[in-house]
């Protein structure tokens, strides 16, 4: 008797579910994708105990026909594919017909659905089998309830992480779906608490404001670009909002969230020298393309894809991010809280005195405050919850304008309690600002950007409010300032009417010299200085093999290395722009770069050499300068293409506004 036999359907479905349904967030992802594919404009996701107890997804999509209900929980039953060639023209998020079969094999599922001009139906499925099918009252669309996930696979349930971690995974998936489909109203509710609620306006920047907060949303820069095969659209946050991991990079292809090493690399190259090592940007990029150029059927969860013409897409992303930040003022803010312009400035002890009873009254009413630091401590991305939000009187409020500044008026005794009802003006202002941002992003006219930033600067005494503008004269992105002095022989202190500036002198000169060396290394020049006595270098046999392989690359950066017999090589000339007292050391360092990497392209070699030389030749810490030297250094920095970060991505200049300084000394309450 043969040993091979066909598995029972229920067992096969449990095995298949291992790939499709890894955790509660997998269920949310599959059901959310089905709702979007059904044409829903409103989707509600409700979870209890992070989805382990129940997950409910309700949409107003097309619904499921009564005659299709018998097949909906069968494996490989789908309405999205019909023949082989359809697999190469996929525009839906789902297409395999595995999701509902896999979910129903490891959970108890109740599905209610109704189509146009039809009666509703309800079916109950357990262990992959339909146990009940009956007519039911239902609105147009689909209402699916998944309960007792992994009830019949206890081993899987055992490896579920903490409820907090699982909720983070769910929130992450819903957030990304909301970003890629801003035209759909999406709500996520956990144990009765709203975690996310979007308005379906079609504006991605509004969704990002809901997820990351208005502080980040105001610093988003719109990008857009085309090639013959690709169109990209998205938002990239300014470098000061960088994070410690890649989790905040969101890439979509035709609305589908994907992970791709090369596209991540393209984004980081677009931010080149603007981010320090180990820091990653907040960004959203959607790539529209013909489905035939992408294979989405290479990964169980469709997270990884294979792309045609990947290099073309890579260069498009790099160039558009670089263009987004070119000529923009990117002076980072310090970590002090912001203070609205109209708050009281106290000049005497009597003015600063606040009665204890009044303070206690205010504190009792301000029970909860919203803090971006608290949000960032959470493992998931939702930062802007629907809790009652109370703004402290001295906290930064980006929506305070001349028409709503009374919300934090000077009358401290009023004990203003900022509830939802009294917050109508606040959220109205939020909507207006987002709409203005959207109009700005839709325009390629630099004037519209300037107008938006000028409006912001009307409400705050803060030079950073205009830091996102595109300067008409790129060499004037560093504001004029008066040199005050130097701290610890390392930081230059300067001031102007906007406040105080601190400039890292080493980082500033490193940027200046980096751009000089980068341009020189890239030049094809015959300006060579001959050496009276050639420099001799000795290498081991395995080092020789690497050097011989990359001799052409060395020549392209000006190093003419010649074999001199045995393990010896000589250099008899060098480019005239090499610092004369460090020629041998520089050549050694260049060769060591190649020996360490063992795989070097000319672009990376030039980059590494420019960074290395600029770092070696720049002013070090504890080096005291004369005032005219400080002034000359800042003037040279103004001429730089990217004067805000050193080649390693560290900030060069930081601004403390006048009001921030006053707050530090308690002159503003």
From Swiss-Prot:
One GO term describing the cellular component: mismatch repair complex
SUPFAM superfamilies: ATPase domain of HSP90 chaperone/DNA topoisomerase II/histidine kinase (SSF55874), DNA mismatch repair protein MutL (SSF118116), Ribosomal protein S5 domain 2-like (SSF54211)
Ranges for region Disordered: 356-379
Organism: Staphylococcus aureus (strain MRSA252)
Signal sequence bounds: none
Pfam family, one: MutL_C
SMART domains from the UniProt entry: DNA_mis_repair (SM01340), MutL_C (SM00853)
Listed PROSITE patterns: DNA_MISMATCH_REPAIR_1 (PS00058)
Disulfide partners: none
GO biological process: mismatch repair
Coiled-coil stretches noted in the UniProt entry, renumbered to this chain: none
Physiological role: This protein is involved in the repair of mismatches in DNA. It is required for dam-dependent methyl-directed DNA mismatch repair. May act as a 'molecular matchmaker', a protein that promotes the formation of a stable complex between two or more DNA-binding proteins in an ATP-dependent manner without itself being part of a final effector complex.
Protein name (database record): DNA mismatch repair protein MutL
Keywords on record: DNA damage, DNA repair
Matching HAMAP family: DNA_mis_repair
Top-rank taxon: Bacteria
GO molecular function: ATP binding; ATP hydrolysis activity; ATP-dependent DNA damage sensor activity; mismatched DNA binding
């Amino acid at each position: 008797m043969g040993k091979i036999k066909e598995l029972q359907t229920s067992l096969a479905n449990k095995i298949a579910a291992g790939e499709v349904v890894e955790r509660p967030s997998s269920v949310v992802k599959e059901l959310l994708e089905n709702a979007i594919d059904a044409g829903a404009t409103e989707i509600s996701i409700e979870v209890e105990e992070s989805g382990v107890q129940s997950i409910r997804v309700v949409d107003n999509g097309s619904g499921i026909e009564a005659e299709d209900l018998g097949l909906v929980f069968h494996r490989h039953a789908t309405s999205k594919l019909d023949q082989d060639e359809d697999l190469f023209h996929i525009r839906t998020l789902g297409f395999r017909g595995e999701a509902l079969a896999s979910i129903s094999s490891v959970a108890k599922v109740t599905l209610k659905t109704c189509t146009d001009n039809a009666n509703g139906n309800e079916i109950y499925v357990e262990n992959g089998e339909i146990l009940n099918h009956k007519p039911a009252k239902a609105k147009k669309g689909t209402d699916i309830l998944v309960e007792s996930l992994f009830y019949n696979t206890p081993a899987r349930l055992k490896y579920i992480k903490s409820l907090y971690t699982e909720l983070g995974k769910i929130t992450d998936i819903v957030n990304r779906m909301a970003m890629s489909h801003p035209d759909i109203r999406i709500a996520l509710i956990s144990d009765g608490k709203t975690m996310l609620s979007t308005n379906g306006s079609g504006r991605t920047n509004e969704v990002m404001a809901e997820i990351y907060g208005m502080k980040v949303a105001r610093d988003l820069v719109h990008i857009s670009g085309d090639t013959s095969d690709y169109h990209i659209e998205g938002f990239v946050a300014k470098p000061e909002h960088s994070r410690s991991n890649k989790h905040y990079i969101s890439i979509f292809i035709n609305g589908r969230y994907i992970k791709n090493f090369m596209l991540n690399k393209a984004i980081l190259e677009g931010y080149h020298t603007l981010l320090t090592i180990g820091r990653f940007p907040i960004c959203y990029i959607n790539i529209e393309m013909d489905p035939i150029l992408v294979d989405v059927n290479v990964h169980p969860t469709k997270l990884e894809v294979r792309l045609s013409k990947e290099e073309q897409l890579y260069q498009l992303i790099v160039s558009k991010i670089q263009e987004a930040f070119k000529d923009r003022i990117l002076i980072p803010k310090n970590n002090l809280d912001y203070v609205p312009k109209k708050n009281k400035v106290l000049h005497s002890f009597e003015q600063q005195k606040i009665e204890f009873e009044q303070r206690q009254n205010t504190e009792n009413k301000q029970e909860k405050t919203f803090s971006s630091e608290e949000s960032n401590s959470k493992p998931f991305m939702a930062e802007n919850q629907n809790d009652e939000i109370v703004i402290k009187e001295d906290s930064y409020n980006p929506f305070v304008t001349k028409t709503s500044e009374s919300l934090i008026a000077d009358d401290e005794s009023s004990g203003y309690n900022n509830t939802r009802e009294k917050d109508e003006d606040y959220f109205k202002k939020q909507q207006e600002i987002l709409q203005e941002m959207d109009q700005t992003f839709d325009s390629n006219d630099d004037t519209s950007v300037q107008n938006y930033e000028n409006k912001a600067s009307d409400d705050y005494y803060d030079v950073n409010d205009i830091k996102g503008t595109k300067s008409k004269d790129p060499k004037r992105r560093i504001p004029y300032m008066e040199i005050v002095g130097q701290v610890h022989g390392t930081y230059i202190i300067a001031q102007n009417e906007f406040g105080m500036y601190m400039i890292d002198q080493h980082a500033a000169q490193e940027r200046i010299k980096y751009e000089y060396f980068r341009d020189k290394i890239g030049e094809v020049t015959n300006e060579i200085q001959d050496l009276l006595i050639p420099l001799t270098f000795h290498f081991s046999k395995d080092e020789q093999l690497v050097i011989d392989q990359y001799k052409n690359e060395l020549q392209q950066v000006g190093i003419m290395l010649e074999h001199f017999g045995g393990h010896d090589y000589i250099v008899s000339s060098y480019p005239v722009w090499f610092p004369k007292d460090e020629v041998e050391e520089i050549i050694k360092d260049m060769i060591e770069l190649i020996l360490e990497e063992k795989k070097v392209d000319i672009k990376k070699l030039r980059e590494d050499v420019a960074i290395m030389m600029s770092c070696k030749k720049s002013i070090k810490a504890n080096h005291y300068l004369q005032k005219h030297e400080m002034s000359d250094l800042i003037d040279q920095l103004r001429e730089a293409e990217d004067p805000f970060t050193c080649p390693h991505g560290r900030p060069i200049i930081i601004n403390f506004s006048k009001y921030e300084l006053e707050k530090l000394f308690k002159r503003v309450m």
